[in-house]
């Protein structure tokens, strides 16, 4: 193989590896950006920023500690697949203050597996014009339908003591008014 071909082959291989390790998606209006990456130890991380680069959530770890420590999804993971998609629908609520609600987001689905035993987990990110949502998913399988989560390791490294809009909860009711306060007051 000629040196020129070797350099091109290496560049292509490295660019493919990099895209599997770090990925960015934008909200539909391009105002927000989600950055997903993996550490050298195989730990998934994310951060959220405005389009101009100003961070909202600093780099934060993702993961789940399982009852069986060998099955924990916090490090020793590798990306096996990523898929991007867009969803846009308008629906009409039965009651409420608005007649129509638009559900519009860009999605990044990252599938990971444990290097030690091959157990899979997926993280589904949905980036809206006004925020981010994500969840962990356990792809089904013959012997992969029962997990015991000991502790969630998800981090939210906020860049400051921002304003929060939240509703308190209790064991016997969810009928409370929304509270507007600083994160430190939640």
Q: Model segments located where?
A:
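N-terminal secretory signal peptides that target proteins for export/translocation
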Residues: 1-3
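Functionally constrained cores in energy, signaling, and assembly domains
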Residues: 5, 23
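Bacterial N-terminal signal peptides
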Residues: 8-17
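N-terminal accessory beta-strand-rich subdomains and adjacent acidic, glycine-rich linkers
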Residues: 24-186
